[in-house]
Amino acid sequence: MGRIFTVELEGRSYRCRFCRTHLALPDDLVSRSFHCRRGKAYLFNRSVNISMGPLEERLMLSGMHTVADIFCCCCGQNVGWKYESAHEKAQKYKEGKFVLERGRIVDEIDLSTEVYIDTHGSTSDTEDS
């Protein structure tokens, strides 16, 4: 595998929760009312720094769609899916758009309020007991 070049988005952005790679801009957000197996999901017009899995037919709550899972190009985590085609006329607006699972992305607000707790005990020799 060769060197990975990523796109750095200007301003506030949605990023991969696992490696903080930029994935989408708030200006490309279409809807926050989507759902996935793991909870909430957001629909975007565009997404960057992703790779796509194979196309597959998937039965969603809104009907049958042709979709491909999308993965962060840096860490390889599944972050959502892309709608390639919708079988029902009312769902055609989704074609070519990206769904990012809310639990797998963070935005600038999340980054500024995130708290990290070290759950592993220290193994320092100088630590007092």
From Swiss-Prot:
Sequence ranges assigned to domain Yippee in this UniProt record: 12-109
Residues the record lists as binding Zn(2+): C16, C19, C72, C75
GO molecular function: metal ion binding
Highest rank taxon of the organism: Eukaryota
Pfam families noted in UniProt: Yippee-Mis18 (PF03226)
Keyword Repeat: no
Sorted UniProt keywords: Metal-binding, Zinc
Membrane listed as a keyword: no
Family: Belongs to the yippee family.
Protein name as catalogued: Protein yippee-like At5g53940
Organism: Arabidopsis thaliana (Mouse-ear cress)
Lineage: Eukaryota, Viridiplantae, Streptophyta, Embryophyta, Tracheophyta
